[in-house]
């Protein structure tokens, strides 16, 4: 949904059928960043952006194939604050990073914030390791 200059994407296991939504959010943020950078190279009108990823609880239900939700706590406010600070970067809350740290490579910015460098493709790595082990006879 949109609020002012902010666009929020809510990833909820009710819709994604995935419990690792923090990792999916980081992957999505990388794709959005790449699309914006490509736009900014091709077009005169530059898009200023910053992406913030926060993790928290929501009350959710699906009505007419649309997610209806009420955030609990400050998950939306947290994401908005991170986005405001994230000048052309992707910032993630400590809580969200800790839930996805096995696949998300990031640099700690302060006690509560991480800057995402990249998201590891575990499937690609798994295939490489399997092929390597086959070639080495193990």
Give residue ranges: language-model regions.
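Catalytic core of nucleotidyl cyclases, primarily class III adenylyl/guanylyl cyclases
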Residues: 1-21, 38-74
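Short amphipathic alpha-helices in soluble, non-transmembrane regions
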Residues: 24-32
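Short loop/turn segments at beta-alpha junctions that line or gate ligand-sensing/allosteric surfaces
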Residues: 27, 72, 94-95
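Short hydrophobic alpha-helical module
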Residues: 31-39
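Intrinsically disordered, glycine/charged-rich C-terminal tails and inter-domain linkers
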Residues: 34, 59, 66-67, 78-138
């Amino acid at each position: 949904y949109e609020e002012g200059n902010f666009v929020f994407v809510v990833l909820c296991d009710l819709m994604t059928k995935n419990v690792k939504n923090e990792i999916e959010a980081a992957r999505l943020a990388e794709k959005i960043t790449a699309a914006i950078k490509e736009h900014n190279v091709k077009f005169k009108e530059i898009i200023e952006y910053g992406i913030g990823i926060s993790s928290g609880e929501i009350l959710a239900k699906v009505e007419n194939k649309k997610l209806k939700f009420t955030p609990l706590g400050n998950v939306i406010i947290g994401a908005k604050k991170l986005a405001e600070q994230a000048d052309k970067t992707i910032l993630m809350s400590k809580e969200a990073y800790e839930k996805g740290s096995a696949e998300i490579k990031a640099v700690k910015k302060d006690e509560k914030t991480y800057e995402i460098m990249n998201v590891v493709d575990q499937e690609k790595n798994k295939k490489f390791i399997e092929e390597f082990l086959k070639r080495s006879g193990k």
